Regions:
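Short amphipathic alpha-helical segments that predominantly mediate membrane engagement
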Residues: 1-7, 31-113, 117-126
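Disorder-to-helix initiation segments
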Residues: 1-18, 22
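Low-complexity, intrinsically disordered, cysteine-poor segments enriched in small/polar
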Residues: 13, 17, 24, 28, ...
Length: 126
């Protein structure tokens, strides 16, 4: 079992939920993964790393710190590593469903994207 890959995938999968804020992480499958990620972080120093990720989830340096520490901790807790591995595909699919508000941006989005539009949809300036 490659703990570094599991840790990296877990942090990548949970980051969109953390960026959205507490209301998103507190429900559903994201909550389950987040609890599994936090489980091996028991010392005060380890908990500080998790708190830092909660505060600045889009900081790549912080994500890297969590990935390295999580990888080390999962080596000692293979059961949690297996649970995270099993949950990752479901969470990654859920994370693809992102709500984006683009307002007054004058930007163009291109690429192979599946976009569902709900609510008001206005093309051009109001």
């Amino acid at each position: 079992m490659d703990f570094a890959i599991i840790a990296s995938a877990a942090v990548s999968a949970i980051t969109p939920f953390l960026v959205k804020g507490g209301e998103e992480i507190s429900k559903g499958i994201g909550k389950d993964l987040w609890e599994l990620i936090k489980k091996p972080f028991q010392s005060d120093k380890d908990k500080a790393i998790i708190a830092e990720l909660e505060k600045t989830p889009d900081d790549l340096k912080v994500q890297g710190k969590v990935e390295v520490k999580l990888s080390d901790l999962l080596e000692a807790d293979e059961e949690t590593a297996e649970h995270i591995s099993a949950l990752l595909p479901v969470v990654q699919e859920e994370a693809k469903r992102v709500t984006i508000l683009i307002q007054d941006s004058k930007n163009v989005v291109a690429g192979d994207q599946k976009i569902n539009v709900e609510g008001d949809f206005i093309i051009g300036d109001k």
